[in-house]
Amino acid sequence: MLRLATRPHNINVTHIGDNEITICAKNIKSNRNHIKGIHACLLATLCEYASGLSLLIHFSPKEYRIILKTIHMTYHYQAKTAVYVTFKITKQQIEEEILNHLKTQDAIFKEFSVEVYDEEKNHICTGLINWQIKAWKNVKMKV
């Protein structure tokens, strides 16, 4: 188990595979909102982490710049227990949906749907996470 942040949120990467990643967060004090559920911003962060880390598994940060464009969250159920997100993307999807487009375009915006569930398998929320992916050679403003 990898720990992304030991404090204050205890977000844990519990599984990394070739095509998927799973991240969990507990219902601890630092993750709660005013009604003792898991805070909406933590749930959005889980969606961003899962999709972003998955992209980093497939794209070298030396070759590609990956920037978050937008997050749109829809909340379905109040999270009162630990939550987890599993994001899956295959090498074939990367090739067909991103790399093929980058052969003819400088950048691509790719939106991913990411779902968060609690320990009882309740669907807590869905995040639509939109990333810009661009080869560094096409970046005009250098870091």
Model region roles, listed by residue range:
Residues S30-S51, E63-Y64:
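Hot-dog-fold acyl-thioester-processing enzymes
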Residues H15-E20, H76-A82, Y117-N122:
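A short, structured loop/turn motif at beta-sheet edges
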Residues R7-I38:
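Catalytic strand-loop segment that frames the active site of acyl-thioester-processing enzymes
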